[in-house]
Amino acid sequence: MLLALTVSCPPTLDKTSTDNIGVQPAYYRYEARRLLSYYDTVKMENATVTDIENKGKNGNFTQFSLSVDYPGQPTKKITARKIVLATGLQDILPSTPGVAENWGKGIFWCPWCDGHEHEDQPLGLLAPLNKIAGLVREMATLNRDVYAFVNGTDNSTTQALATKDLPQWKQYLQLHNVTVDNRTISEIKRIKSGDTHNADPSLPSVPEFDLFRVEFTEGKPVERAAFLTSFPDEQRSDVGEKAGVELVGGRLQANASAGLITNVPGIYAIGDANTDGTTNVPHALFTGKRAAVFLHGKFPPRFL
């Protein structure tokens, strides 16, 4: 029996979401559950795993005890022989008013997911000074009117980090006509929505025309149509780390040549939470299948 324990969805699917561009994650997950409902060996429950206890081996099998919180119920214990961690990552957004409210709707981190929809529009970069040159590399073929809002981070420390990454970073920004604004941002206000609900749903991409006003603690505001960001992220759940899974660069260590098994026998890590460094829906689907097929083959035939 396969037990899938699920939690809440992020706000939007990005442009790397197979053929489901613009589909809300809640519906995407609903459709996956509908398809899985035809298999009587799969059971899905809405619950949160808070702890994984490694019980060692019973013969040839790994054993685990899971502490699981169900809505409105006491914590339950569930046993498992194999565990697949699909816990994902979460972005660490700044507290600046307007960032979280508009995240994924004109403020984005992936130019290959959302950049084309804002091509040739006034673009803002939201990042520390030492991350700006890297963002410019990513969007240089899409936008020419670019402001870098470094939010007070233009100092000797970040300048040294920028020089370490790209010694000629100042000339590089000048070459691409990037204006660096070091003022402290007080708020990012949406002036216009770029919703494309009335666009032809058969099209793979349509322009989005958002508009924002960046306000500062001093001086005049600046208007931008979209923002490319560089914010840190973290594991959405710590259950893998608490179970002994090694973190490498903030990711769950997974061996891609062995079904994405972690350093803990019996525990696998898939999706963007693991160490193979890819963050999109097709990749998550692929890694899920790879882990499932691999661990399925680890059970003797009499248990299948």
Regions found by a protein language model. Give the residues of each.
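Residues at the starts of beta-strands that form the adenosine-phosphate
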Residues: 122, 144-148, 266
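FAD-site-proximal beta/loop scaffold in flavoenzymes
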Residues: 101-117, 230-278, 284, 290, ...
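Glycine-rich adenosine-cofactor-binding loop
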Residues: 123-134
